[in-house]
Amino acid sequence: MPEETQTQDQPMEEEEVETFAFQAEIAQLMSLIINTFYSNKEIFLRELISNSSDALDKIRYESLTDPSKLDSGKELHINLIPSKQDRTLTIVDTGIGMTKADLINNLGTIAKSGTKAFMEALQAGADISMIGQFGVGFYSAYLVAEKVTVITKHNDDEQYAWESSAGGSFTVRTDTGEPMGRGTKVILHLKEDQTEYLEERRIKEIVKKHSQFIGYPITLFVEKERDKEVSDDEAEEKEEKEEEKEKEEKESDDKPEIEDVGSDEEEEEKKDGDKKKKKKIKEKYIDQEELNKTKPIWTRNPDDITNEEYGEFYKSLTNDWEEHLAVKHFSVEGQLEFRALLFVPRRAPFDLFENRKKKNNIKLYVRRVFIMDNCEELIPEYLNFIRGVVDSEDLPLNISREMLQQSKILKVIRKNLVKKCLELFTELAEDKENYKKFYEQFSKNIKLGIHEDSQNRKKLSELLRYYTSASGDEMVSLKDYCTRMKENQKHIYFITGETKDQVANSAFVERLRKHGLEVIYMIEPIDEYCVQQLKEFEGKTLVSVTKEGLELPEDEEEKKKQEEKKTKFENLCKIMKDILEKKVEKVVVSNRLVTSPCCIVTSTYGWTANMERIMKAQALRDNSTMGYMAAKKHLEINPDHSIIETLRQKAEADKNDKSVKDLVILLYETALLSSGFSLEDPQTHANRIYRMIKLGLGIDEDDPTVDDTSAAVTEEMPPLEGDDDTSRMEEVD
């Protein structure tokens, strides 16, 4: 084996090298990692830092019951040491370390339960970045390394070295190198084309992206050069003394790490010789920079955090150029422990409701280790605009998506997040200006919530805002509407439509406005779905003014008059129903019209005109539903209108008057249009109107037209409803 020949050059006193074969599934996984192209190789560093963090968690946990466990090293930290000369990247932690048995079992001979599952997921097209969720994150090192060396020291064992170039086997030997005290050092011998991971900028970028909120300091050691100005001999001597002192301190503090990067003694001697001649010299030094100084903001006390800090964190989290609109920072303790920080952005993303869109934008951490940012079970889809982090103390670090779906802990977290989001919106509603901005961007989400979330429907309904017939240019809540209701008013009246002007001028609101009853204008397509679920508010039923059975507050006298009108027009209603046949379910005398002659209303459980329009616009609509949901139309006539009164007299004078049919059909089609419906055959309706115009202008149907070509067109025009239809139109006066 190449590993063994390598180790034969080692000093004689070293113990014999043992070679082990990788367990079959692990060998297969490594081969898959090495031989497949992955674009996001950078995740190897996240996995190794997470492993270090786990090891540090373990020793910290053990030290709680036995403080002497930390005698081998009190400081808990992670160091990253890139070396361009050796083409190695070293990750050192002062965690619990591994015994010889741990090394052999954990890194090669015993497959984790997730190994096979992860390989299957990979072959099915899963992202390599999921590797940590299957407990095999260590092997991601081979995405960038041709050889990996692991040196480790556990309190209960000697220091050992594990090494493998992934050729199906690995070696383990006692390590006689620099004593570690306690912990693990992973040395990655990088592939030739992966040297970007030795660049200071690249390492910082990856740590910031993936491991910014690890609970232990991550320090990057970089060898740098600096210019040194020398003014005269005295200053030179003074500087030399200071340098020696600094060098001694550094050697005593960071000996192992500095040796990893490479000793600088020769260079220092060389410099000492050059210094006398030059005024300006170059000096090498090891720069140490802590990369995750920002303690996870969500672990701090909310009282100690300024709005600016929240703003900076929000921008770094979301890459948004604007400040957030609102923030909610809270922790839950008791049987379950987690912290969360939630933000409402100022504007909705342009692809908020796209299917391919991530279902949520909340990052899930487990004990400060980032797990995933697309956990669908964390928050309902209607809140997918909320940004933030959730950090759980109870979820296992190697949790998979399947486990998350079943997790009871996650269900409790989700319930709390929804509750806190609604609290946040309610707080936001107290500030009219900010709530207006919020509502403009996210009202659809609130309405979608009412449609989907039955548990929180009541709270969500309090967040709704609408224009009404009495609100002018200001949107009001349902609560405001209820405070303005008339004494004998039992219902909340609303109308759905396309625009505010269209619904305000609708025939349906005439009588209500005359009576001084306020009508809510619902002018977004989603309102139709929302109101199907929102049956009532504070004990008051929501009633559509475009549907049958509209009850208006009436006194006894009004009721009596209405009954008389019904009797008077009963015969006309019957005649109209016979003419319209299946087009309408029934024709009745209306109590909602004032200036319009008639209108089309729908049955209580059928679609409104607006809903029918929306459904017809669906590309993937179900035509079978269209049939029974859209067919229930009722024609209501206004008994006080001169057109209806004259039509009644005409029908009663001569039951066989052929012009009555055309007038009824014309009235029906016009009512369809004014009530918001579309015509099935607009051309026939147009021809009917043109004939009426001709009659109005006194033009005889048989008169030749001015232009021969247009005469030809007239001749070719199809009859309206058979030949007898034409003769009836001619009889219209």
Curated annotation (Swiss-Prot):
InterPro entries: HATPase_C_sf, Heat_shock_protein_90_CS, HSP90_C, Hsp90_fam, Hsp90_N, Ribosomal_Su5_D2-typ_SF. GO terms for cellular component: apical plasma membrane; axonal growth cone; basolateral plasma membrane; brush border membrane; cell surface; cytoplasm; cytosol; dendritic growth cone. The keyword Mitochondrion applies. The modification Phosphothreonine is found at residues 5, 7. Residues 683-733 are annotated as: Required for homodimerization. Gene3D superfamilies: 3.30.230.80, 3.40.50.11260, Heat shock protein 90, C-terminal domain, Histidine kinase-like ATPase, C-terminal domain. PROSITE patterns: HSP90. One of its GO terms (molecular function) is protein folding chaperone. Its EC number is 3.6.4.10. ATP binds at residues 51, 93, 112, 138, 401. In the resting state, through the dimerization of its C-terminal domain, HSP90 forms a homodimer which is defined as the open conformation. Upon ATP-binding, the N-terminal domain undergoes significant conformational changes and comes in contact to form an active closed conformation. After HSP90 finishes its chaperoning tasks of assisting the proper folding, stabilization and activation of client proteins under the active state, ATP molecule is hydrolyzed to ADP which then dissociates from HSP90 and directs the protein back to the resting state. Residues 730-733 are annotated as: Essential for interaction with SGTA and TTC1. It is found in: Nucleus; Cytoplasm; Melanosome; Cell membrane. The modification S-nitrosocysteine is found at residue 599. The modification Phosphotyrosine is found at residues 314, 493. A motif (TPR repeat-binding) lies at residues 724-733. PANTHER family: HEAT SHOCK PROTEIN 90 FAMILY MEMBER. Belongs to the heat shock protein 90 family. This is Heat shock protein HSP 90-alpha.
